[in-house]
Amino acid sequence: MLRSFGLSASALLALGATGPLLAQSAESNGASGSGVLEEVVVTAERRTEDVQKIPASIDVRQGTELAEQGRISTTQILEDVPNVTVGFIQPGQSADNPNGNIAIRGVASTQQTGGRPGPSSTAVYVDDVYQGIGGDFDLNHVEVLRGPQGTLYGRSATGGVVAFHTNDPVLDKFSTEVYGEYGTADLRNGTVAINLPLGDELAVRIAAHEDDSHGYWWNVDGDTTSIKEARIKLLYQPLENLKVVVSASSGLYSSFAGGQAQATTATGAINFNNGSTTIAPIAGDQYTQYSANVSYDFGAANLTYVGSMHSFYQNGFEGIVGPPFMPINTIGGSSPDQFNSQELRLASDPGGKLSWLVGANFYSNIYRATQTSIVQYASECGPCGITDPTPGVDGGEIFSNGFQGSLKDYALFTEETYSVADNLRLTAGARFDRQEQTQLTFYNFNVNYDQYGQNVGTCSNLEAVTGTPLPCVYSASNATANYSNFTYKVRGEFDLTPSNLLYAMVSTGYLPGDAQLSPDPLADGSVTFKALNFSQERLTSFEIGSKNRVFNDTLQLNGAVFYYDYSGYQQAAQTGQTPSGAPIFVITAVPVRMIGLDFDATWLLTPADRLTLNAGLVDAQITSFPDLPGTTTPESTYLAYSRLPGIPSATANLIYAHTFTLGNGSILTPRAEARYVAGGNSVEITQLQNTSGVAGAACGPGQLTSCGDYDYHSDYTIVNLGLGWLSPKGTYGLNAYVRNVGDTIYVEGLNINHGNAQAYPSEPRTYGASFHVKF
């Protein structure tokens, strides 16, 4: 079954991992003197448990280690987690959340239409808040749950869950932590966190983070980025069994990476042009978030309430080349999206023959965004623009579009586990969701510009320009969609020994439906809109796994095999464009099946030597291409690949660290990592875009080259090296690293627009050093 991956077991042993290579803590390297692997406690199933005792495929990354290794971004945090892919997100297009493009086991998010974000296939939580933001600093740990988690986590947990847990305040302990990093491209990254007790029942923790980089590729402003974040948490614990944590956070993500990046050859050579520098920042996200977490232990049960409100504002800028063959600046922005999440759950205390959990959840989102395209001049971007006849005067507006809408989701859920015997347990869970959504899309079109791209005249000039009288303004009515969904989980687990667990599970997940709209040109040249209602996508998972500790707790072997039946996998495929260049979409819906495995081994060879090998295999294939509803056009017309793009068929990570204990008790840790990724394509394209030799059909000069040639990357391996020093009590730490030793560059993301393949490259070789101080 797995031979199609083309990867033997012996080959896996030669493959490797990722991440900046810096010193780990003494305990993470087994240097604490215990000589055994440490226990890791998580709340993945809404209870506090040892991760080795949970019958599910889970990975954990500790915040202290990630900070010491300089791994700050979501991509870096998750880069060595098996079968997890963080897709490229163009700045200013982060789908209401900077973490909105995570795929687990091949389950990718719905492609957006015309700037409208689609639902995420991975549920991201920050401090128990769904779609929370700001979890990448002052981080305690990250939990990654692979496989559908619909019963406990609900909407968007089709592929799995990524849960960020930041540090809570601590009573009766004053502490300060400072992290700093400097690296290639003037990278400056720093975090400060202060824990301040305010009596026996009250404590506050304040954390601030800043991350700035000039980027690696473009001149002038190039891909400069800047991140500024802050959070304050207040802990109130008047009773031993009552705990209240309230939090407020704010952040600003700014980037100048919205300029044009054009792949000029199909061999990987990439030409980069800057976008206009008159708009600053070119892309940015801004958020504020407020949350409260209250838990009360009754003795026989624990009641938990989690409530949050947050807003998200986004703007973006991009330069493209479009009809009528003149450069275009696209400016996008959103009014603050408003999010409201409320959850109440009651769970039995562990230890009984029957453990249970019941809960209710409410989630709402109100959103609005606009996008405007104007002609771009040479004075703004050099060779990418046309001659500016009147310096200082903006080019004409070509078109603008936008959307606004609201979404509400109501849910009830429950899960019970019954101990049939001391070593045999059965679990059943269920969840019911009801979603209500409305959306209005509006569209303005203007071709009243002359050969210099400046606005001239009124709508009467349209006939002279196009030969056809066209109206100037188009609008659309509401699209509405209501969905109800039921998900379930059935699982059996058996303890072969106290350190060896075997489990089998059938579970379901769903990706929420969505109401979107697309331009729909009519025969007379006018444009109306058609509704593109995405149905709910349902996935049924069959999984068998095992978790093991052997050799006196020095070797850990975890693994799982899975089969997914994914009915109605949907994507918005571009079929053409309006006279102004606005894209026109249809929805494709095809059956998909995923087959794969996760494997993770950690071996404490000696108290000073740790070796980690993990691997992920997934074969994500479209099994058939039915005709589009109401047509005789096969959906393969709009889907060039049978294998889902952006999902590597194989990844593997190999990590080795050795701890030297010096005479004064300090620790020196050299570390080496290697990460292997199988080749493939990163974005979906149509059959026409995948055709060579047809003028105007595909990409490149003359649009004669298959867009797929620009997008494909071969297998690659990234090697990272690092060296870290830790003081005897862990108060001080110094680290140095080299990432991507071989300077391997590949296309990380591709945006195809009007035959122009805009490519975004991966990071080159980088160097850096970091420090931390804790007292």
Predicted regions and their residues:
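N-terminal Sec signal peptide and the immediately downstream disordered periplasmic leader
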Residues: 1-81, 195, 240, 296, ...
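Acidic, small-polar-rich N-terminal luminal/periplasmic segments of exported/outer-membrane proteins
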Residues: 36-171, 544
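Outer-membrane beta-barrel translocator/receptor signature
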Residues: 120-121, 136-141, 146-230, 241-242, ...
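Solvent-exposed loop segments that connect transmembrane elements
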Residues: 218, 256-278, 317-331, 372-402, ...
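Structural signature of Gram-negative outer-membrane beta-barrels, strongest in the C-terminal barrel
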Residues: 235-241, 346-349, 355, 361, ...
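Membrane-embedded beta-barrel scaffold of Gram-negative outer-membrane proteins
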Residues: 291-318, 495, 501-513, 517-518, ...
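Gram-negative outer-membrane beta-barrel transporters
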Residues: 347, 356-357, 422, 426, ...
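C-terminal beta-signal and adjacent terminal beta-strands/loops
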Residues: 565, 675-692, 724-775
